[in-house]
Curated annotation (Swiss-Prot):
Lineage, top ranks: Eukaryota, Viridiplantae, Streptophyta, Embryophyta, Tracheophyta
Protein known as: Leghemoglobin Lb5-10
Induction profile: Strongly reduced levels in boron-deficient nodules. Inhibited by abscisic acid (ABA) in parallel with lower nitrogen fixation in nodules.
Maturation and modification: Nitrated in effective nodules and particularly in hypoxic conditions; this mechanism may play a protective role in the symbiosis by buffering toxic peroxynitrite NO(2)(-). Nitration level decrease during nodule senescence. Phosphorylation at Ser-45 disrupts the molecular environment of its porphyrin ring oxygen binding pocket, thus leading to a reduced oxygen consumption and to the delivery of oxygen O(2) to symbiosomes.
One Pfam family named in its UniProt record: Globin
Length: 147
């Protein structure tokens, strides 16, 4: 079964919830990443020279980009059944930064935890699954572009 209209709607509505507190949700997202994989701090230029996760325009922009790409992936999965990267350099950027498979797992866990918090009472297993499938589609496309 392909990605459904309902799954896309769940991703879109929770994306809007995420954006309502972009600063707080961005900090939460990167805090979870660094709790799970402290060495990943060096992968993010905007975190390299900081003591911890500090709010900044670059941090917010990157979080918004990651979550936005997952939202866009949901739309592609529904309409095309696969994710095609709009930015051909994403694979090369991830290779250059030294991103490996375990990093994708950590980011996925952080993304799902952040969406759960951002969604509040609207969170459900169905919403979680929609984000998980959309993220997996994006991660697969990025990994393919990394080879």
């Amino acid at each position: 079964m392909g990605f459904t209209d309902k799954q896309e709607a769940l991703v879109n509505s929770s994306w809007e919830s995420f954006k309502q507190n972009l600063s707080g949700n961005s900090i939460l997202f990167y805090t979870i990443i660094l709790e799970k994989a402290p060495a990943a701090k060096g992968l993010f230029s905007f975190l390299k020279d900081t003591a911890g996760v500090e709010d900044s325009p670059k941090l917010q922009a990157h979080a918004e980009q990651v979550f936005g790409l997952v939202r866009d992936s949901a739309a592609q999965l529904r309409t095309k059944g696969e994710v095609v990267l709009g930015n051909a350099t994403l694979g090369a950027i991830h290779v250059q930064r030294g991103v490996t498979d375990p990093h994708f797992v950590v980011v996925k866990e952080a993304l799902l935890q952040t969406i759960k918090k951002a969604s509040g009472n609207n969170w459900s297993e169905e919403l979680n699954t929609a984000w998980e499938v959309a993220y997996d589609g994006l991660a697969t496309a990025i990994k393919k572009a990394m080879t």
